[in-house]
Curated annotation (Swiss-Prot):
Official protein name in the record: Defensin-like protein 11
GO cellular component: extracellular region
Major localisation: secreted
Any Gene Ontology biological process: defense response to fungus
Transmembrane regions listed in the UniProt entry: none
Signal peptide span: 1-29
Organism: Arabidopsis thaliana (Mouse-ear cress)
Length: 85
């Protein structure tokens, strides 16, 4: 009985985690959001200058905007096209 409950709990946790990852993966698969190729692992520690650099280089890559995110530190390029939220 205990093994069945543990197995069910593991399956439930797996489904919850995979659902959250799938939403993020869908955005990346549709090319709605990707990490800036010119600034991999960019910490955006320069505040306005870092955010401006992120935005400019993402636009150079064809995105509509670039956004600095802090967890984990990186520069994300975002596209606005049908299917992207």
């Amino acid at each position: 009985m205990g093994k069945t409950i543990s197995f069910s709990a593991i399956i439930l946790v797996f489904l919850l985690v995979s659902t959250g990852l799938m939403k993020q993966g869908d955005a990346q698969a549709q090319k709605c959001e990707w990490e800036c190729k010119l600034l991999p692992n960019f910490p955006c520690w320069l505040k306005g200058a870092g955010e401006g650099l992120c935005d400019n280089l993402c636009k150079y890559e064809g995105a509509i905007s670039g956004v600095c995110v802090s967890d984990p530190h990186r520069c994300l390029c975002r596209n606005r096209k049908p299917g992207c939220s």
